[in-house]
Design a protein with these regions (language model features):
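Mature catalytic core of soluble alpha/beta enzymes
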Residues: 1-11, 17-225
């Protein structure tokens, strides 16, 4: 991701099994690390105490007394129609990105294929698709931040999109919706069903799905020239 005109500060944060890559214009590594650790610990603690949060492949009721990040995960899972853990990584990325965006004008937080992007201008995000070569999406401007979840090759749900990108109002929702798309791609007529799904999930801004020689676009996705 190419983002900043100034020389950016880039650093990595390892939080247990998650490796986050952060790009900003400011030295905020300590703040980012604290936010990532707090988010991971809250989600992990809740998952250990509530097995259904960890194991369910379907949405579960939003728990009123749970930490805010747990409620956000459950709400995203309900919207996307998937189990809560499909939004775990996106939730951590979201929390770190939104925390930093309070005081930093442009920031990118990435973990695997999940991105939080806050930018005042248009930028390109590269989505890799194996031997066919990469494809680039135009993202921004999104001053408050936007979530993008991408997958190349075998997806988490066992489907095999050549490339997948979901844009949403938050990374936690993008992560959950990407899992929903992957589940549909394993069915007959999966590409068309996946595009219909992306159009109807509240908060999803758009998506790109490539399967074999076919490409599908839903919503406000702009391909770079």
């Amino acid at each position: 991701v190419r983002l900043l005109r100034r020389r950016p500060k880039t650093f990595d944060i390892q939080v247990h099994d998650l490796l986050l890559h952060v790009t900003t214009a400011e030295d905020v590594e300590d703040e980012a690390r604290a936010a990532a650790l707090s988010s991971w610990e809250q989600l992990q603690a809740y998952a250990l105490q509530h097995p259904e949060f960890r194991t369910s492949e379907r949405p579960i009721p939003v728990p009123r007394e749970a930490p805010a990040i747990v409620r956000e995960v459950c709400r995203a899972a309900v919207r996307a129609g998937v189990g809560p853990m499909h939004a775990f990584r996106g939730a951590v990325v979201d929390q770190v990105g939104r925390f930093l965006a309070r005081n930093v004008t442009e920031v990118v937080v990435r973990c695997g294929g999940d991105h939080f992007i806050a930018t005042r201008r248009r930028m390109k995000l590269t989505v890799h698709r194996g031997a066919a070569g990469p494809i680039a999406l135009v993202v921004g401007p999104h001053r408050e931040g936007v979530g993008v979840s991408t997958t190349a090759g075998r997806g988490r749900a066992g489907a095999v999109p050549d490339a997948l990108a979901v844009l949403a109002a938050s990374c936690v929702l993008a992560d959950a919706a990407a899992a929903g798309v992957e589940a549909l791609l394993g069915e007959e007529g999966g590409l068309a069903a996946a595009l219909r799904y992306l159009r109807r999930v509240p908060g999803v801004l758009g998506g790109l799905v490539l399967v074999d020689e076919r490409i599908g676009v839903a919503g406000g996705v702009e391909l770079a020239a």
